[in-house]
Structures are given as structure tokens and as C-alpha cells.
């Protein structure tokens, strides 16, 4: 089997409807639109969300909440994640190299879930109090940048 020999299974694809190509085609003259009426006209039909004049659902439901434009998204790493990485130094460059971060502009926060056994030097944007004490107890250093 080669890529240039691939074919669709028989009956897997329908042929395109050719509209308005003579009455014997079955889709000539009115081209499947019927006679007159809103949907027979050019640009005919109702807009999305129109419910026949009834107040549409998007107007019946209340507005809720807002999007905070100044919020900061942090990449969350637990102590168990740091243990799995097996690095002596945790910073933006090492995490990008290990493909934990996409780029160096991402913000990092270390959380205290799990345990850490060896000393690690951590240089991140935020650290929880439990994570900080656990890292320092294991002989590591924490620097918030």
C-alpha cells in the first residue's frame, strides 16, 4: 500500500448536488428551494439565534461575570513533579530545556503536593509556604524572582 494508491471506499462519499441544471436532473428550475417565500429569495432565511419573533434564549438569560484582563496564568508544579525531573537547579531555562515550559516568559508556581528528597536550588515566580519549607528542609534554596 502506498500513499498515492489510497482511495475512498465505494459509497463513502456522495457526489455534489448540481443545482439548476435542467428539469430532468430533479434539481432544475427552483433548485430545491420550492416556490417563492423567504427561503427562495437571495440572502433568504433567518439569522442564527432567531426564534420566530419570540425573545431568543441569549436575551432571556442574564449576563454573568466578566473576564479579568490583568489575570496572570501560572504553570503549577508540585514537589512530586520536581522529584521526577531529577534536576539540581530549577529555573526557566532548565524547565524549557526539559519541555515543561513552552518558553521562558511563562510564570511558574511551586506547590507542596508530594515530597522531595534531594537538595534543589529553585528560582521561580511564586512558591507556596509548604513547598518552601519542604525544599529548605531537604537542603535546597528558594529564590522568588
Swiss-Prot record:
Chain positions covered by the region annotation Disordered: 1-54
Record flagged with keyword rRNA-binding: yes
Keyword RNA-binding: yes
GO BP, one annotated term: translation
Database matches in HAMAP family: Ribosomal_uL15 (MF_01341)
Subunit structure: Part of the 50S ribosomal subunit.
Protein name according to UniProt: Large ribosomal subunit protein uL15
